[in-house]
Structures are given as structure tokens and as C-alpha cells.
């Protein structure tokens, strides 16, 4: 009997469906199909969607361009969750239309935090004083 792989990451199918859902959501938001005052005044990006293993739940990570306050945008998306789910169902051929959940995309914040850490004076000092192991040794050395 074949055993399931023990990897904990998303399967290839989850990744493929997540990308299809991401494209569908991005298209609906870009076209302005949802009539909402908040969504009408914000350009919303969908950098990532994660699917549950059974493909019945899609978590969309969203971020308004320009770093504007994302709370009203997420609230507006939640209000229109049903319409967005129907729009995704029309664009993505699945047995079940996934339930949509919206979360704030924190990758930019995490990247900024790492950048601040790397620019920290103590880290710079450590990086500058690190031994350079990459230089080739000269000599016959055995």
C-alpha cells in the first residue's frame, strides 16, 4: 500500500488552485465589479491565497496599495464575501466554491523588520568583523 508523503507544506494541487483563486479575486477587484465605497477608493492587491487541504477554504492575504489602513478594506471584502465567492466560482472550475476568508498581508512588514535588523549598528559591526572564509588559500596545503 502506498504511503502519503509526510511533507507539511501545501500540495501541488493546493498551490495550483490557490493561484487560480488569487487571479480570479485580483481580476474581480481590478475590474471594480464590487460596488462598495471603500473598495472603489482603494486599489487592493492579493499577493497570496492559501487553500485548505480539502480546497473548501481559501484564505486570501490582501493589502491596499500605498500602505493605507487595511482594516476598512478587509471589512469591505468580508461584507462582500458571498458575491466574491460566486465570482470565484464562475472563474475557477471546482466541485465546490471555496469559502473565502480575508487576512492582512504581513510580508511587507516582515521584510521591513528584517531590513531594520540588518541596518542595526550591532549587526553591521558583526558583519564587518566576520572572517572572510570565501578567499581561496594560497600554497600547496594538504
UniProtKB/Swiss-Prot annotation:
Glycoprotein found in the keyword field: no
Subunit structure: Monomer. Binds 30S ribosomal subunits, but not 50S ribosomal subunits or 70S ribosomes.
GO molecular-function term, one example from the UniProt record: ribosomal small subunit binding
Gene: rbfA
Similarity field: Belongs to the RbfA family.
Compartments, as annotated in UniProt: Cytoplasm
SUPFAM superfamilies: Ribosome-binding factor A, RbfA
Comp. bias (Acidic residues): 129-142
Organism: Methylobacterium radiotolerans (strain ATCC 27329 / DSM 1819 / JCM 2831 / NBRC 15690 / NCIMB 10815 / 0-1)
A Pfam family the protein falls into: RBFA
Keywords: Cytoplasm, Ribosome biogenesis
GO BP field: maturation of SSU-rRNA
Protein role: One of several proteins that assist in the late maturation steps of the functional core of the 30S ribosomal subunit. Associates with free 30S ribosomal subunits (but not with 30S subunits that are part of 70S ribosomes or polysomes). Required for efficient processing of 16S rRNA. May interact with the 5'-terminal helix region of 16S rRNA.
Name of this chain's protein: Ribosome-binding factor A
Region listing for Disordered, in residue ranges: 123-142
